[in-house]
Amino acid sequence: MTSASTKVGEIFSAAGAAFTKLGELTMQLHPVADSSPAGAKWTETEIEMLRAAVKRFGDDLNHISCVIKERTVAQIKATVKRKVYEDSGIPLPAESPKKGPKKVASGVLSPPPAAPPPSSSSVPEAGGPPIKKQKADVTLSALNDSDANSDVVDIEGLGETPPAKKLNFDQA
């Protein structure tokens, strides 16, 4: 199995060969010396084929760039979320959804599942398992909220023992 760096090297070698060929084709289209009959060999169809190939190449590179940017943004958001949870002393949820809400057959987004109401007591009910007190979740949407105090996130009520903590992301 080849390493990632070897694969990237092979990709750039192939790209170099492709750009060399593109340079040769461009020189045939626009010869330096007027005496060269190579420019006359190109038909409109061939020129259009070359134009389409170069456009597809650019479009494919743009698509790859978008995929990488989206993945990078998702990784950054996940890292920030994990850091916020760690800094606030809240355990990270065991199951974090990989995708947004699922689409139903009608094409309408299904509402997120309703969370059970928080219990104000950690005393177990008769015959049932002990019920833990629910903690408020700090979500990325709350962190990214552009309403009042967007630079400060108040995480009151996350723990009963320590006083309320404030996160300020503008500090260096």
Curated annotation (Swiss-Prot):
Annotated InterPro entries: Homeodomain-like_sf (IPR009057), SANT/Myb (IPR001005)
Signal peptide: none
Main location, first listed in the record: nucleus
Segments of skewed composition (Low complexity): 120-130
Residue ranges with Pro residues bias: 110-119
One function term, GO molecular function aspect: identical protein binding
Keywords from the UniProt entry: Chromatin regulator, DNA-binding, Nucleus, Phosphoprotein
Residue ranges constituting the SANT domain according to the UniProt record: 38-86
Subunit structure and binding partners: Component of some MLL1/MLL complex, at least composed of the core components KMT2A/MLL1, ASH2L, HCFC1/HCF1, WDR5 and RBBP5, as well as the facultative components BACC1, CHD8, E2F6, HSP70, INO80C, KANSL1, LAS1L, MAX, MCRS1, MGA, KAT8/MOF, PELP1, PHF20, PRP31, RING2, RUVB1/TIP49A, RUVB2/TIP49B, SENP3, TAF1, TAF4, TAF6, TAF7, TAF9 and TEX10. Component of the nucleosome-remodeling factor (NURF) complex.
Function: Component of chromatin complexes such as the MLL1/MLL and NURF complexes.
Protein name: BPTF-associated chromatin complex component 1
